[in-house]
Amino acid sequence: MLTLDTLNVMLAVGEEGLIEEVVLTLLASPQLAAFFEKFPRIKKAVTDDLPRWRDSLRRRLKETEVPPELTEEVECYQQCQRLSTPQFMVQLPQILTLLDKVHSPYAAQARKLVTDNATFTPALHTLFLQRWRLSLVVQTTSLNQQLLEEEREQLLSEVQERMTLTGQLEQVLVENENSAGRLWDMSAGQIKRGDYQLIVKYGDFLAQQPELMQLAEQLGRSREAKSVPKKDAPMETFRTLVREPATVPEQVDGLQQSDDILRLLPTELATLGITELEYEFYRRLVEKQLLTYRLQGESWHEKISQRPVVHQDFDEQPRGPFIVCVDTSGSMGGFNEQCAKAFCLALMRVALADRRRCFIMLFSSEVVGYELTAEQGIEQAIRFLSQRFRGGTDIASCFRSIIERMQGGDWYDADAVVISDFIAQRLPDDVVAKVKSLQRDQQHRFHAVAMSAHGKPGIMRIFDHIWRFDTGLRSRLIRRWKR
């Protein structure tokens, strides 16, 4: 079949001018003018998309087939161009019949041209073909304009949908022209309004927690390298205060909250035998909130130890991608869940602004991943925000997934961020050793975002930096009071 693009070439119809006219008409539409005025940072991203629009229109012209009637008329015209005047006169009745058959706009004019001239001269032959070609050019141009107008309407509809989406998410995710451009690129997917409202919802929550946004920016833009002990470094004296509780019964000095089973109050011990309160007992045991006797004799003393001399390097480090692990255990539900999701959204904003990748992994009984800065990043973010935190805590699997990803070529300079309350089992020795190897040999940095003041120190000791955001009621009230 004859395509419209081929017909344009045959008749020397200037399709580039028609395409440019469509693009300029689209840019001059009132909708785009109002959008550019409201969101000036996205204007450059939209104008950078113009080559893609032009390519789309060219591709549409190449793929569109010419109607069968016009194809038949064009083939007849091409055959007539090769005929001499006597041969053309012989074929003229069949030509006029074909023009009537295909309902050509030139049919009436052709018959009039023949009937008005008794003698068919070579000049009349040339005039007949010239006017026929002009009719074909008009038909082709009209077909081009009709097709491009349909494409313009479709393109305008697509752009309006993307403008609506981008306008809604601009305040949440756009920090500079880099992020504006990437947001516009990601808006090309088929996203429903009700879906992306979830991002707007967590963006509003993030706006109510400015400390969380500030924490994400500090973590995302921290370039300071960690202290690394040099090989064969000299030892230095290191003094720490160590608390040593009394190990023998002494005089009771009062009550305190701790996890000392040997000094429990009888009332606390009684709850262990009640099925309905057993879970509450273990929770308070983990959080060191059980009421116990406080004995005299507990004291602090100075412990002296030796450690290698370390040198703190303050050179700026290159910014690599984020690998963010989010704890989805039951203890991370409620307000913790909101904070964790909003924090990931804030890291996505930083990653878009700095042209970095941001990969989210949820860990409970299994590990699920979402790349928020990919081409389908908005859909990935919506899926992530739709998850519910109701699983268990398998932080070891989380670290193994991080280690495996860091060993890939695309993530060689990644920063790992673990968001959790860190109320979990201790890490296996092989995982700890592998993490320390990555920190020491490849300068990978591991960040902890602690959502609780009761995280296990043994787990958190492995991180280069601990960013604390206590979600307890007291801390929330203090933060609100300070604003």
Swiss-Prot record:
Main location: cytoplasm
Record key words, sorted: Chaperone, Cytoplasm
One cellular component term from this protein's GO annotations in UniProt: cytosol
Domain of life from the UniProt record: Bacteria
Summary of subunit composition and partner proteins: Homodimer. Interacts with RavA.
Subcellular localization: Cytoplasm
UniProt keyword Nucleotide-binding present: no
Species this protein is from: Enterobacter sp. (strain 638)
Family the UniProt entry places it in: Belongs to the ViaA family.
Protein name, entry field: Regulatory protein ViaA
The keyword ATP-binding appears for this protein: no
InterPro entries: Uncharacterised_CoxE, Uncharacterised_ViaA, VWF_A, vWFA_dom_sf
Role summary: Component of the RavA-ViaA chaperone complex, which may act on the membrane to optimize the function of some of the respiratory chains. ViaA stimulates the ATPase activity of RavA.
